[in-house]
């Protein structure tokens, strides 16, 4: 990822969110429980406050035209594709991938507009309150918000095979279904999701060595 960012002069932030928790009201836990009352896991939802931070010059000290979230289990395999490429040929403000399960926000690309700042704020606040304890909290927040104005017509979807493909012949699903979303040499990244950590590292190393990514 660092090498890709260096090529395009991007400013990356790497954040380990795997054990983060944030104080947020939720009706789904017992407020009287001193261990969990009022606390919901950050994990996937951390992407919304982080995106919001880098969309506001008064917070981050920069005026960013675009912001991007890329899960740390994604390996960029095609350095020739800049982030701005995904905004070519359309006027949408948000770019997401889709896979067999629908919305797949392992990569989130946004123009820095008032509408998108509103979206990440809404996902961070209302989305968190509704879905903070859900295993796919970020996905559910997007599904809810993107179904309605003012956001419904501001998103452009690309296949996960193009943006964040699955490693070939790894995930246990019907082969004909899986093949629609598996990595090809034209894929931008490979997404090593829902796998044992050591297995992810092993697959990542294979891609790095085969494609000379470092």
Provide a role label for each language-model segment:
Residues 2-6, 35, 39, 109, ...:
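The feature represents the membrane-entry module of six-transmembrane cation channels
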Residues 3-65:
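Active-site-proximal specificity loops/subdomain of glycosyltransferases
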Residues 9, 91, 152-154:
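A generic structural signal for alpha->beta connector loops
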Residues 15-17, 97, 158-161:
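Conserved beta-strand termini and adjacent loop/short-helix elements that scaffold enzyme active sites
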Residues 23-29, 105-108, 164-175:
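Short, solvent-exposed polar/charged micro-motifs at secondary-structure junctions
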Residues 38-117:
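GT-A fold catalytic core of metal-dependent nucleotide-sugar glycosyltransferases
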Residues 49, 115-214:
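Catalytic core and acceptor-binding pocket of nucleotide-sugar-dependent glycosyltransferases
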